[in-house]
Structures are given as C-alpha cells and as structure tokens.
Amino acid sequence: MVQFLKAKNYAEGYTVSVNDNKFFGLVTMSKFPIVDDDHIKFNNDQNNSFLYTDLLIQNDTIRIYNAHIGSARFSQSDYEVMGTEGNFKTWPHQQSEENPQIVTRLANAYKKRATQTKTLLTHSYTSPYPVIICGDFNDTPVSYNYRNLTHKYIDAFTLSGNGTAGSFCSIPMLRIDYLLHSDFFNSYDYQTHDEELSDHRAISTILEY
C-alpha cells in the first residue's frame, strides 16, 4: 500500500493482533513529512482508537485524525434475527458472543460511541493546527454523534457528495464513514468508491486551502 500510494511516510497503531502476523488498527500514509503522531486507545474499549498525525506541507502544519469508533459487533445470526439478509463478514476485532438482547447491545453501543466521539473531539479542540477528521464512526447522519461532529467540522459529503454515498458494503445505503474538516479547508470531488476491499467502501475528497 505504501508503494502503491507513493507515500513514503506513515504512522500506525494497532489494537488487535492475531497469531503475531495479522494486525488490526489504524494507519495514516502521507507523501508529506510527519512531524508528530500518537495513537490513543479509548478507555471504554481498547479495540477502538484514534491516531493523530501532524503533516508539514510547505510551511504549514495540519493535523489529521484517523478514527475507529465502536460498533455493536453484531454476528450473522443477529442480523438474521433483525430480518436483514446478506453476508455480513465479522472481523477479528468485531468478535462477540451471540446475545439475544439486541436492543440492550444497541443502547450500550450508542453510549460507548458517544463517549468515544466526545474524547476524540475534545482532543481535536486542543489542536494548534487546522484539522481533518476521517474514519469509521458506525453512526448515521441522523445520529447524536454526527451532530456533535458537524457542530465545528464540515462533512465533505455535504459540499460535493451525491446520492446516499453508502459506505457499508452489506447495507449499500448506510453511510457511517466520514471525512470532516476545519473551515480552513475547501473540499470538493467527494467520492464513495465501488471496490469492496473490506466490509466498508473507501471514501475520498480533495482538500485545498
């Protein structure tokens, strides 16, 4: 991936390892020099985290947050109980015991995401640089957490996106991945890519300032 993107600089942080040769976590790759970075796990779930990376672009520094906010970790049987068809692949960091109390698990997941999103935003507010936030937030645009995210930051989709821009492969109209930025930036050409390289589709936008 580093070679494909011609991104010689990268920062990474892992939350799960399998057999010491498979790692699940976050990575931010850049053609620009990285002057600082840190990987921070959330206190309420060590499987979820965010990675911030400070990039030097000419004489300017910007901060990128790469985040993975917690899901309810439903199994295939859970989706079947809810009447949703399809093959939902479960990744190692999503493993959980089957639990018939789906409503309870949903409620707990909402609370967990609210705490994690607040932690991420609180950290971002201390940034001395313009901010870009991207990642898997496991919440829809009508959620409480989305409203908090867009209170200060701009959702790039709202400027140049089209359609529903669904990013979760198994539920094509579900948009739970976001690219947000400070008003320091202008963004355009927002895209949701068709390739299914994981259980989510990649999203992209062009930023300028």
Could you tell me what each predicted segment is?
Residues N9, H93, P100, T104, ...:
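General secondary-structure edge motif
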Residues K22, F88-H93, T117-K118, L149:
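Short hydrophobic/aromatic-rich motifs at helix boundaries and adjacent loops
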Residues H39, K111-I132, F137-Y209:
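Metal-dependent phosphoester-hydrolase catalytic domains
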Residues M1-G83, N186, Q191-E195:
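Structured beta-strand-rich core segments of catalytic domains in phosphoester-bond hydrolases
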Residues F4-K6, E98-Q101, I171:
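A short alpha-helix capping/helix-coil boundary motif
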Residues Y79-T104:
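A solvent-exposed, charged loop/short amphipathic helix patch at secondary-structure junctions
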Residues D38, I102-Y110:
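Surface-exposed cleft-lining segments at the edges of enzyme active sites
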Residues G13-V16, F23-T28, W91-S96, N138-P141, ...:
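A broad, low-specificity signal for short, low-complexity segments enriched in glycine/proline
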